[in-house]
Amino acid sequence: MRHLNQTCKLNRTTSHRRCMFANMLKSLISNERIETTVPKAKALRRYADRMITLAKKNTLSARRQAIAELMIRFNPLTPKEQRAAKEGNTQAYNDDRLVIGKLFDVLGTRFATRQGGYTRIVKQGHRVGDNAQTCIIEYLTD
C-alpha cells in the first residue's frame, strides 16, 4: 500500500518523469538557475537537495549514485560524434560529463558547511500561453 508515500506525478509516466527531472537537474547544476512552473520546481527541489548532499560526501560511491540519478551514459562515440570530434566540436558530448565535475567540485564545496535548504524558489508571473504560474529555482550563492 502507498500510505504516506506521495510523489508529485505531474501527469506523466514514470520514465518520462525521471528523464524530465534528470534533464532539469543537469540544467540546474550547469546554469545554477532555471525557469519552470511552480509544481515542477517544488518537485525538483527534492532531487536538487539530494544531489548536493551526495556532492558533499565526495566519495566514489556518491559520484556513481549521482551519475545514475542524472542518467549520464558513458557510451563510446557514434560515427557522427567521431566526425564532430575531429572537427573540434565536442561540446555537446562533454556537457553531461562536465555537470558531474561542477556538482562535486564547485557546488559540493560551496555548501560544505550548510545543513540543508540549498535551493530557492522565486515565483514570477503567469505564462502567456496557458496561464501557468512560473518561477525560478536556483541554488543559493553563499
UniProtKB/Swiss-Prot annotation:
Please tell me whether the keyword Ribosomal protein is annotated for this protein. yes
Q: Which GO terms of the molecular function aspect are on file?
A: structural constituent of ribosome
Q: Which SUPFAM superfamilies is this protein grouped with?
A: Prokaryotic ribosomal protein L17
> Which InterPro entries does UniProt cross-reference here?
Ribosomal_bL17 (IPR000456), Ribosomal_bL17_CS (IPR047859), Ribosomal_bL17_sf (IPR036373)
Enumerate the Gene Ontology biological process terms: translation
Q: Which UniProt keywords apply?
A: Ribonucleoprotein, Ribosomal protein
Q: Which cellular component appears as one GO term in the record?
A: cytosolic large ribosomal subunit
Known partners and oligomeric status: Part of the 50S ribosomal subunit. Contacts protein L32.
- Similarity field: Belongs to the bacterial ribosomal protein bL17 family.
UniProt name for this protein: Large ribosomal subunit protein bL17
Q: Which organism is it from?
A: Protochlamydia amoebophila (strain UWE25)
